C-alpha cells in the first residue's frame, strides 16, 4: 500500500524545526510520499503575515536539499478558508487506495474539537501526533481522550498499511523554534540565522519580510 504523510501548517516562515521534525519522521516511518501542505487562511488562527506566494517560495527554498519532500498547494488554490476535513476528502478522492496520515502537534490534538467537522477526520486519515513530554502536563479534553482510547496505536506499520483510523504519538525531538518567535525576533532585528535554512534566511532579508 502506498503511504502518504501530510504535514500542514502556515509555514510563516518555514524553519529548521519543521525540517528536522520531518527528517525524524521519515527516518522512523519512511512514508512513500511526504507533503508539506501550506494553509491558506486557517479558520482558528490569525491570518498569515507573508503572502501565499512568499510562503510557497520559502518552502521551495527550504526543501531544495530534500527532493523526497514535496509541496501540495491545494489549500492555497481554494477560494474558501482552510478546513482540513475538505482537504483530506480531496486527498482521499485522489488517492483512494493509499494510507493517509495527517501530522499534527500535540497542541493540535488538544484543539481538535475546535476543528470544523473534526469527528470525520479520523475516518479520512490516520493521525501522527508529534508529542513532547512537557505537553503531557496539559489537560486533555474528554472528547479527545475518548478518541485516544478508541484509536491510539503506536505501531508504525499501522500508519503505513491502513487507510485511516489510527492515532500514533511520536516524539520527533525537541526544537525550541516557532514561526511566531522568529517573526518577533526579526521585527526586533535579532539574529535568527541559526533557526532558518540559509536560503530562507536570505529570501526573508531580500524581501524584507516580518519587519
Swiss-Prot record:
Task: State whether keyword Transferase applies.
Answer: yes
Task: Tell me what reaction this enzyme catalyses.
Answer: nicotinate beta-D-ribonucleotide + ATP + H(+) = deamido-NAD(+) + diphosphate
Q: Which GO terms label this protein's molecular function in UniProt?
A: ATP binding; nicotinate-nucleotide adenylyltransferase activity
Which keywords are on file for this protein?
Answer: ATP-binding, NAD, Nucleotide-binding, Nucleotidyltransferase, Pyridine nucleotide biosynthesis, Transferase
The residues that cross the membrane are none
SUPFAM superfamilies per record: Nucleotidylyl transferase
Any one GO biological process: NAD biosynthetic process
Associated pathway? Cofactor biosynthesis; NAD(+) biosynthesis; deamido-NAD(+) from nicotinate D-ribonucleotide: step 1/1
Fetch the InterPro entries from UniProt: Cyt_trans-like, NadD/NMNAT, Rossmann-like_a/b/a_fold
Its EC number(s)? 2.7.7.18
* Function text: Catalyzes the reversible adenylation of nicotinate mononucleotide (NaMN) to nicotinic acid adenine dinucleotide (NaAD).
NCBIfam families the UniProt entry points to: cyt_tran_rel (TIGR00125), nicotinate (nicotinamide) nucleotide adenylyltransferase (TIGR00482), PRK00071.1-1 (NF000839)
Entry's family note: Belongs to the NadD family.
Q: What is this protein called?
A: Probable nicotinate-nucleotide adenylyltransferase
- Which species does the entry assign this protein to? Legionella pneumophila (strain Lens)
Taxonomic path = Bacteria, Pseudomonadati, Pseudomonadota, Gammaproteobacteria, Legionellales
Amino acid at each position: 500500500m502506498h503511504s502518504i504523510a501530510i504535514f500542514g501548517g502556515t509555514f510563516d516562515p518555514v524553519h529548521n524545526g519543521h525540517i528536522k521534525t520531518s527528517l525524524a519522521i521519515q527516518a522512523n516511518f519512511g512514508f512513500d510520499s511526504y507533503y508539506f501542505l501550506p494553509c491558506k487562511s486557517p479558520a482558528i488562527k490569525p491570518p498569515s503575515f507573508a503572502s501565499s506566494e512568499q510562503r510557497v517560495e520559502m518552502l521551495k527554498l527550504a526543501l531544495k536539499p530534500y527532493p523526497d519532500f514535496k509541496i501540495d498547494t491545494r489549500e492555497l488554490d481554494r477560494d474558501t478558508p482552510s478546513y482540513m476535513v475538505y482537504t483530506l476528502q480531496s486527498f482521499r478522492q485522489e488517492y483512494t487506495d493509499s494510507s493517509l496520515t495527517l501530522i499534527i502537534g500535540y497542541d493540535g490534538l488538544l484543539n481538535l474539537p475546535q476543528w470544523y467537522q473534526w469527528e470525520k477526520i479520523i475516518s479520512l486519515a490516520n493521525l501522527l501526533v508529534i508529542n513532547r513530554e512537557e505537553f503531557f502536563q496539559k489537560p486533555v479534553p474528554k472528547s479527545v481522550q475518548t478518541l485516544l482510547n478508541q484509536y491510539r496505536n503506536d505501531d508504525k506499520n499501522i500508519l503505513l498499511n491502513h487507510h485511516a483510523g489510527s492515532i500514533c504519538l511520536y516524539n520527533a525531538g525537541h526544537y525550541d523554534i516557532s514561526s511566531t518567535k522568529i517573526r518577533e525576533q526579526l521585527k526586533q532585528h535579532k539574529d535568527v540565522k541559526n533557526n532558518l535554512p540559509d536560503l530562507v534566511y536570505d529570501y526573508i532579508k531580500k524581501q524584507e519580510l516580518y519587519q
